[in-house]
């Protein structure tokens, strides 16, 4: 890879740098995104980052019944962003192939996806806010859908992290997060 003249950009000492990274290995495929501050941030950039982080954490910590679809989980993940009447115009996540296409279904976290989640499915958790000529923020990890057991209310599923790459905390407006997400981030 090398940047072409019409698409390369100078990294200016303000705002964010979004790094979408991954690789194909004989033991699997990775897809990770982090957004790093590279200089002073506006209040709006810090708010957006905090809301995206909250969405990301909520998805990673989700506990749900075994009949939930990608559409239901996508809606759940968008809650912290929608609470501020903001939306991200992409899915929250996609299935990940094994030594194949990094975007592979049938599972995904997006509007109108009717696929029911099952243990063993791998998914990305990548909410983001993108405003043309203003800001681009995404935090992406990979998660595995896991079985959390059954009780009188149903069969429960959740997610286990597959990506252990530090998340930048510098931009976070800590006062806008409750104790549980802060604990998750620190753990």
State the predicted function of each range.
Residues 1-187:
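Active-site neighborhoods and metal-handling regions in enzymes and metal-associated proteins
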